[in-house]
């Protein structure tokens, strides 16, 4: 891997001479070499937009530059960090009892060097998840085991998992840390059965110190893989090895997940990550700009942060898009230029943000229920049923976590919210009167 990095660094020095400084700073400086397989050099771009731009505008120039350096005609492929994490890694040929050696090769290959605790921006939506991750990294298998982190796409779950891995390796270089997606776990498991190497597969993942497994929800419906992961989990937990799991939803909401797995995921700590608030989004943009050596006016930071509120990946992508647009038309970056650069990805009128309070008020109007009754202990049908409808709509129409929804309904447990959602979802399939009432509530909320 060191030789590939040296080659790419040499290529970057040559490319810096061939393109303008803004273009180099915007597109090429932040790239890294990932691997070289069969005359295909894979380069990591910081985000999706940068990847697409590099593919369409710089592939030929990069290929020519590499030919000048090596005399070999290499094809160029670009990936982003998320897909890099799921790339197949070329490991040394398997040998008898070599599972532990294989594990030692994985950490450096599979962890993104940019995803550390130092580069993670802490805000109200991720503060607890960050604290829990740091506690796990400082004392693996002693703080929370397993640690289960859930939240939407692009909110920092993978970043925290990689940060845990980096921290453990930094403080214990001999630690065997493995990061992979559940999809990769599934594919390797299937291949091990096909190639009659099930024992090697088990040794590989049951002889590690820290297992970081991403997107566990993709195990849903895969009975054999769930069975294998169940035994892997047990083996590691019994040996006091740390397990960290991420998902886009809490364990109880993962469909067709075996109860015995679900219960094990709940043994340790479950924490969520929610979309960043305005202050956190601005802090993320400032940190990104500083890391990339970009001089971005505060008004532009504020504009982007106000317009992009879904996730961190889109936020950083918007910043790069603005910088790229500025370099292309050779104009200084300001709020007007940012608006022009982002006009294709920002709708003219942003959809109305609906709060749990709005939902309670609308449901109360339709069912003649007082606002305070939604939080009260009353269990009469005239109150309990509208309350369940309000919980259902809160789950459907807001980004609030289950605990947050429960809190807004008088501090009820998240399982109560799940039950309400399941009940109303089922009734809506057959109850035409309920369908009309929910439609009426939705009209009020528009």
Swiss-Prot record:
Q: Where is this region: Domain I, interacts with DnaA modulators?
A: 1-92
- State any single GO MF term: DNA replication origin binding
Annotated segments matching region Domain II: 93-109
Question: Which stretches does the entry tag as region Domain III, AAA+ region?
Answer: 110-326
Which cysteines pair up through disulfides? They are none
GO biological process terms held by the UniProt record: DNA replication initiation; regulation of DNA replication
**One Pfam match:** DnaA_N
Q: Where is the composition biased (Polar residues)?
A: 96-107
> Where are the residues of the annotated region Disordered?
87-107
| GO terms under cellular component | cytoplasm; plasma membrane
* Domain of life of the source: Bacteria
Where's it found, cell-wise?
Cytoplasm
What SUPFAM superfamilies does the record point to?
P-loop containing nucleoside triphosphate hydrolases, TrpR-like
State the family named in the UniProt similarity comment for this chain: Belongs to the DnaA family.
Q: How does it assemble?
A: Oligomerizes as a right-handed, spiral filament on DNA at oriC.
Q: Know the name of this protein?
A: Chromosomal replication initiator protein DnaA
Q: Which organism is it from?
A: Bacillus cereus (strain AH187)
Underlying gene: dnaA
């Amino acid at each position: 891997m060191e030789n590939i990095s040296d080659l790419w660094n040499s290529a970057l020095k040559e490319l810096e001479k061939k393109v303008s400084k803004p273009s180099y700073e915007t597109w090429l400086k932040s790239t890294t070499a990932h691997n070289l397989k069969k005359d295909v050099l894979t380069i990591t771009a910081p985000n999706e937009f940068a990847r697409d731009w590099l593919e369409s505008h710089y592939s030929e120039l990069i290929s020519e530059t590499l030919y000048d350096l090596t005399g070999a005609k290499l094809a160029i492929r670009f990936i982003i960090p998320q897909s890099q994490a799921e790339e197949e890694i070329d490991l040394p040929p398997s040998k008898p009892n070599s599972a532990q050696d294989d594990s030692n090769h994985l950490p450096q290959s599979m962890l993104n060097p940019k995803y550390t605790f130092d580069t993670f921006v802490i805000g109200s939506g991720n503060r607890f998840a960050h604290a829990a991750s740091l506690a796990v990294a400082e004392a693996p298998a002693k703080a929370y085991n397993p640690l289960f982190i859930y939240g939407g796409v692009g909110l920092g779950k993978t970043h925290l998992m990689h940060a845990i891995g980096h921290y453990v390796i930094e403080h214990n270089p001999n630690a065997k840390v493995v990061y992979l997606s559940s999809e990769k776990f599934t594919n390797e498991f299937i291949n091990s059965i096909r190639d009659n190497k099930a024992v090697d597969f088990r040794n590989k993942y049951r002889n590690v110190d820290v297992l970081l497994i991403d997107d566990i929800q993709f195990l849903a419906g895969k009975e054999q893989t769930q069975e294998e992961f169940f035994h892997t989990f047990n083996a590691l937990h019994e040996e006091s090895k740390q397990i960290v799991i991420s998902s886009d939803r809490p364990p109880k909401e993962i469909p067709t997940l075996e109860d015995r797995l679900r219960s094990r995921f709940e043994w340790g700590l479950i924490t969520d990550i929610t979309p960043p608030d305005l202050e956190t989004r601005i802090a993320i943009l400032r940190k990104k700009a500083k890391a990339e050596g970009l001089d971005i006016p505060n008004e532009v930071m504020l504009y982007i942060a106000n317009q992009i509120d879904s996730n961190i990946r889109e936020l950083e992508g918007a910043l790069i898009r603005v910088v790229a647009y500025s370099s292309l038309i050779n104009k200084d970056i300001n709020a007007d230029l940012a608006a022009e650069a982002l006009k294709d990805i920002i709708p003219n009128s942003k959809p109305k943000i609906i709060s749990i309070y709005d939902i309670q008020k609308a449901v109360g109007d339709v069912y003649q229920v007082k606002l305070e009754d939604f939080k009260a202990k009353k269990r009469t049908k005239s109150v309990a049923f509208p309350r369940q409808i309000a919980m259902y709509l809160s789950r459907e129409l807001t980004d609030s976590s289950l605990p947050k929804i429960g809190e807004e309904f008088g501090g009820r447990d998240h399982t109560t919210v799940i039950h309400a959602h399941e009940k109303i979802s089922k009734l809506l399939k057959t109850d035409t009167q309920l369908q009309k009432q929910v439609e009426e509530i939705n009209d009020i909320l528009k």
